């Protein structure tokens, strides 16, 4: 029939399990899932005496699993690939090998004139991607874990980083963000747009895991890089550091 298959909701386990590779891998409880460049993550980890502890292999590239010593215990850092379905494939594997709590960290587009130098802690995400529907019944938004978001906001404030709560529009159609859609999404309360948040939050909810997401606008980063006093040149490193500090508290 003409009914969209995205509406078929089924809670039963998948035929392929996320630990299908049966790797001898025991990850720590906490992880930072970073939509940032590979070299940047590697530099950040090595500068803090961290090391590579394994690799998630995918058809097109390998994703190194980095470990760093945080205040209390070890913490894992993994690069996140762009796009909801690709990102969820890796989030699932993090959870399958022992991770319980994840802070995702990434760039977003601004749907309105936003204050400069602000980081956003996502409270809800509009499900305009396909992946979340494989994890949760159809709904317009997915609500993110409230206590996790509160903790993350607290950590950012403690570190004197301006932050605000937000709703994000998670879309698969990067090049299909039309004027009308932007207007409509803004009317629904979305201040920023990203590609993965709704799917990651849905996956976490289905698996019963803790998940939070920090977003920063490309323009924010551009502005931050000129804010020498507080931020220095490596604004993205600051974002990574905040992700680590937030994950430690979850």
Where are these regions (language model features)?
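Short, small-residue-biased leader/transition segments that mark boundaries at the very start
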Residues: 1-6
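Preference for short coil/turn "hinge" residues that link or interrupt alpha-helices
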Residues: 8-9, 188
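N-terminal low-complexity or amphipathic/hydrophobic leaders
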Residues: 11-60, 69-71
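Glycine-rich phosphate- or other oxyanion-binding loops that anchor nucleotides, phosphorylated ligands
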Residues: 56-250
């Amino acid at each position: 029939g003409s009914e969209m298959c995205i509406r078929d909701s089924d809670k039963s386990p998948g035929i392929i399990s996320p630990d299908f590779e049966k790797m001898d891998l025991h990850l720590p409880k906490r992880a930072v899932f970073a939509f940032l460049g590979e070299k940047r993550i590697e530099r950040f980890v090595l500068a803090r005496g961290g090391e590579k502890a394994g690799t998630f292999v995918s058809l097109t590239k390998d994703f190194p699993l980095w470990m760093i010593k945080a205040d209390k215990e070890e913490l894992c850092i993994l690069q996140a690939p762009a796009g909801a379905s690709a990102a969820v494939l890796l989030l699932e594997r993090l959870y399958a090998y022992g991770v319980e709590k994840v802070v995702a960290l990434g760039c977003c587009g601004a749907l309105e004139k936003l204050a400069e130098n602000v980081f956003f802690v996502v409270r809800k995400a509009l499900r305009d991607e396909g992946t979340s529907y494989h994890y949760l019944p159809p709904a317009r938004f997915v609500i993110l874990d409230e206590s996790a978001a509160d903790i993350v906001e607290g950590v950012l404030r403690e570190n004197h980083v301006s932050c605000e709560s937000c709703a994000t529009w998670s879309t698969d159609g990067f090049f299909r963000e039309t004027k009308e859609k932007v207007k409509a999404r803004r009317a629904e309360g979305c201040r920023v747009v990203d590609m993965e948040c709704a799917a990651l939050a849905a996956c976490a909810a289905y698996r019963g895991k803790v998940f939070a997401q920090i977003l920063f606008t490309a323009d924010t980063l551009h502005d931050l890089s000129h804010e020498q006093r507080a931020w220095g040149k490596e604004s993205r490193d600051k974002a990574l550091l905040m992700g680590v500090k937030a994950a430690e508290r979850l």
